[in-house]
């Protein structure tokens, strides 16, 4: 046994090969990141790329020309300007420590509308111009919202339905938020945990099914109409809750997953275009299995629709519905 181990070790050492890699120089490009929403003015962040082998970090581009077009007007409908009043911190991990990069929005005065295409063009004298397009679909009406707080005291059951469009591919996202009142009348918002056995939410997570009894557990879900194209679709969700807190504890401790001390739960239901779905779907795959580890693996790229550059320019048509209003705790 010792002889076999020794031979294996010698053989392994003899098979080692050193490869010299010649990495081509990196030419920085503009990076565009932005999400158009029908509830707010257009806003994007412009930065530049760095080499994967560089020790430098991307930085904000302050003197770019950012023009917004729609599918009706030939000329730009808006010119986005830097909003220095609101700092945007972009988090990243550097040698196992989380750090932040300071960025700012280029913001316009146009509020995008649904059922329309938008294109953005970014120009800068030191970089090649970039562009990207996105489509904002029409909103979907939510019907028959039902709340169940009786069947299980540890769960809030939520169900609703909507009519899917039979003439096109549709993409959706569901998120839940808790809205709590703090001292001084200010509001605090947190993400809610969603539990569901809805088949259209994707592949079954057998680990979650074994321990929770649900095929889906998460803070948000992105899905398509593949299993219900053109149908009147019913969605059922459960939200786990904790015990009531004493009123004296209300202002001292706000836990985003303890809903009984909050006065409202908000349902956010969004419709997407295919580019937005591609981004969120690839981002989820990248987070789950895209990083290389000591055993190797295949890097899953994150979707980008920016021509001649990097980043993503996508859109969402979101509606928020308060589904469980109750008096605020005093």
List each model region and its residues:
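Sec-dependent signal peptide recognition
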Residues: 1-4
């Amino acid at each position: 046994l010792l002889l076999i181990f020794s031979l294996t070790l010698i053989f392994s050492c003899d098979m080692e090969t050193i490869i010299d890699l010649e990495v081509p120089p990196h030419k920085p490009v503009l990076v565009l990141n932005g999400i158009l929403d029908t509830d707010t003015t257009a806003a994007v962040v412009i930065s530049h790329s760095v080499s994967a082998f560089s020790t430098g970090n991307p930085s904000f581009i302050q003197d770019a020309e950012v023009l917004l077009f729609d599918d009706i007007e030939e000329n730009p409908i808006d010119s986005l300007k830097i909003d220095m009043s609101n700092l945007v911190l972009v988090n990243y991990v550097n040698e196992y420590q989380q750090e932040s990069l300071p960025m700012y929005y280029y913001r316009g005065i146009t509020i995008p509308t649904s059922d329309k295409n938008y294109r953005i063009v970014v120009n800068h004298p030191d970089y090649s111009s970039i562009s990207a397009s996105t489509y904002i679909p029409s909103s979907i009406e939510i019907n028959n919202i039902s709340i169940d707080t009786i069947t299980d005291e540890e769960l809030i059951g939520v169900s609703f339905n909507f009519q899917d469009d039979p003439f096109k591919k549709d993409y959706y996202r569901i998120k839940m938020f808790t809205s709590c009142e703090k001292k001084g009348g200010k509001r605090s918002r947190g993400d809610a945990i969603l539990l569901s056995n809805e088949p259209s939410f994707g592949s079954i997570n057998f680990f979650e099914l074994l321990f929770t009894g649900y095929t889906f557990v998460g803070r948000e879900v992105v899905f398509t109409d593949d299993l219900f194209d053109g149908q009147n679709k019913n969605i059922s969700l459960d939200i786990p809750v904790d015990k009531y807190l004493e009123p004296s504890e209300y202002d001292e401790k706000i836990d985003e997953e303890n809903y009984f001390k909050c006065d409202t739960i908000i349902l956010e239901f969004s419709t997407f275009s295919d580019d937005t779905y591609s981004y969120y779907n690839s981002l989820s795959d990248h987070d789950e299995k895209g990083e290389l580890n000591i055993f190797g693996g295949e890097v899953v790229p994150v979707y980008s629709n920016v021509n001649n550059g990097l980043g993503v320019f996508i859109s969402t048509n979101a509606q928020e519905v308060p589904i469980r209003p109750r008096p605020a705790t005093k």
